[in-house]
Regions:
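Serine-hydrolase catalytic machinery in alpha/beta-hydrolase-like enzymes
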Residues: 7-94
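Short, conserved loop/helix-junction motifs that constitute active-site signature segments
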Residues: 42, 123, 146-150
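Phosphate/oxyanion-binding active-site loops and adjacent basic polyanion-contact surfaces
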Residues: 76-84, 108, 171-172, 201-202
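Alpha/beta-hydrolase fold nucleophile elbow
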Residues: 95-106, 128
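Gly/Ala-rich beta-loop-alpha elbow adjacent to hydrolase catalytic centers
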Residues: 105-113
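Conserved hydrolase catalytic core segment
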Residues: 115-126
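The feature captures the conserved acid-bearing segment of alpha/beta-hydrolase catalytic domains
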Residues: 132-213
């Protein structure tokens, strides 16, 4: 794992290969290492990278919105989207040019990955993955109908996530299926039903998403 500072962000990357998977899961070093360890055994042609530090409710939310129990999403995603061309260029300088780029996120990071795929026009961007993604985010499905995603889309969700006591989050399964139907109009979409709840086997879920997108499995 290589760690470095670039563009005002802390960054980390590991692996080598012509496929880049950018991870959006809160800039957690241990989680990144776990995902990288799995991919090192199964997906040798992938460079895994991420950047932070991250405030989930600010940086991964595409617009301002109110959650439950006073939670506030401040809509800072566009700042990170604007950084994507720069970090890809810097990673290309360090690791060589990438023929394919994928965006892979967890929870609100999954929402951010799909949002970025819808608004970022980049020739090498081939798709995105949302694992246990916050598809319940206010206004998201309406936005997606007007801003199509292309390429490959991987969606996964834990079977118990719909049992959340939070009424907004409890709609996640219904909303994820709605996102699947919308995205299928313009993209190749795969959905995987995972066992457990929102925090079950997170590294494995993210690694499976990368493996699918990078055609390692």
């Amino acid at each position: 794992m290589t760690e470095f500072e670039f563009g005002g962000f802390s960054c980390r990357a590991e692996g080598s290969g012509g496929t880049l998977a950018l991870l959006f899961s809160g800039f957690d070093r241990e989680l990144f290492a776990d995902v990288g360890g799995i991919l090192a055994q199964s997906c040798g042609g992938v460079t895994l990278a991420e950047f932070g530090d991250i405030d989930w409710d600010r940086d991964y939310s595409p617009w301002e919105a109110a959650g439950t129990n006073g939670r506030v999403f401040s809509g800072g995603a566009d700042r990170l989207v604007g950084f994507l061309p720069d970090i890809v260029q810097e990673l290309s300088r360090r690791y060589g040019e990438f023929s394919r780029v994928y965006l892979c996120g967890y929870s609100l990071g999954g929402l951010f990955a799909l949002y970025s795929a819808a608004v970022w026009d980049f020739p090498a961007l081939c798709g995105a993955a949302s694992c246990s993604g916050s598809m319940w985010f206010p206004g998201w499905t309406e936005f997606l109908r007007e801003h199509p995603i292309h390429g490959d889309v991987f969606l996964s969700l834990g079977g118990k996530e719909k049992n959340s006591p939070d009424p907004m989050m409890a709609s996640v399964e219904e909303k994820t299926m709605e996102v699947k139907r919308i995205a299928e109009r313009t993209a190749h979409v795969v959905f995987r039903n995972e066992p457990g709840g929102h925090f079950s086997r997170v590294p494995q879920r993210l690694a499976r998403a990368v493996e699918y997108l990078a055609e390692c499995k």
